[in-house]
């Protein structure tokens, strides 16, 4: 896997535009020159989420603000002591979502992977705005995906090292190898700091019985594949869960050479439905 990193040095240039900025502000500006937005990956992913076309998708950016040029950045990098707020929009037009994702600079972009009720379009119709409310679990129309978030263990709010990232990707590939039905019915990629798998379900009803099946499946996978290096997140079963949008940047902490910001990727997908989740 090719990983793009970036190092910024300003010590020998008093007039450099990054001088006088905080470390976080430097990281935000550095994010402008980190791996760019991959619209093709975003489009492929959105097509997977919305086949068949059902409801809408929420896109969300956390602790963010819009600068004077219209870019969406970290709130604490805009200045004025503002820590940022939740910015969100609901989309039934994939191209409009991609157009909004192009505005992100040094912030992570997330989407809901299960279809949400179309009524939510009335909050922010195919555009990003400051949001007081976001998609709730009971706004989800059906359980379309089982989400495996495979992350290397590390301190909170920092990006992974290359070694940590490779460990997570190797664990993902082991899961796909042990469960070929996941590869046949799922999609997978790199989350920027770890790896992910989405397993396509048969649009289960969004009820407690079927939600419990997802919880049990994640617990079983966690028991089999988690250790003191990589873990399977068991908290991803809630219907309104978010996933990093492929093609966008995962920007945790500061953009350092040893823990760089990286792009979320979509590396493969199958075409079948997995319909064998059973209790016990």
Q: Each predicted region: which residue ranges?
A:
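Signature for HUH/AEP ssDNA processing cores
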Residues: 6-10, 16, 21-193, 200-220
């Amino acid at each position: 896997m090719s990983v793009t990193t970036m190092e910024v040095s300003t010590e020998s240039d008093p007039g450099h535009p990054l001088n006088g900025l905080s470390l976080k502000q430097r990281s935000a500006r550095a994010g402008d020159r980190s791996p760019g937005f991959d619209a093709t990956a975003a489009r492929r992913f959105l097509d997977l989420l919305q086949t068949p076309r059902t409801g809408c998708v929420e896109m969300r950016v956390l602790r963010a603000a819009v600068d004077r040029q219209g870019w969406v950045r970290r709130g604490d990098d805009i200045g004025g002591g503002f820590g940022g707020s939740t910015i969100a929009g609901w989309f039934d037009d994939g191209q409009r979502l991609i157009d909004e994702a192009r505005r992100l600079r040094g912030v992570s972009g997330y989407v809901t992977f299960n279809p949400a009720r179309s009524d939510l379009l009335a909050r922010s119709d195919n555009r990003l705005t400051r949001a007081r409310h976001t998609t709730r679990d009971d706004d989800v129309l059906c359980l379309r995906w089982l989400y495996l978030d495979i992350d290397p263990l590390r301190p909170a709010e920092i990006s992974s090292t290359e070694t940590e990232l490779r460990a997570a990707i190797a664990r993902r590939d082991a899961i796909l190898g042990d469960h070929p039905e996941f590869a046949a019915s799922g999609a997978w990629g790199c989350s920027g700091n770890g790896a992910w798998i989405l397993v396509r379900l048969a649009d289960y009803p969004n009820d407690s019985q079927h939600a419990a099946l997802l919880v049990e499946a994640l617990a079983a996978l966690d028991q089999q594949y988690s250790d003191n290096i990589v873990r399977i997140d068991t908290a991803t079963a809630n219907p309104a869960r978010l996933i990093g949008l492929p093609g966008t940047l995962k920007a945790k902490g500061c953009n350092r050479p040893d823990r760089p910001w990286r792009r979320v990727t979509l590396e493969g997908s199958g075409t079948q439905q997995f319909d064998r989740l059973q209790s016990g």
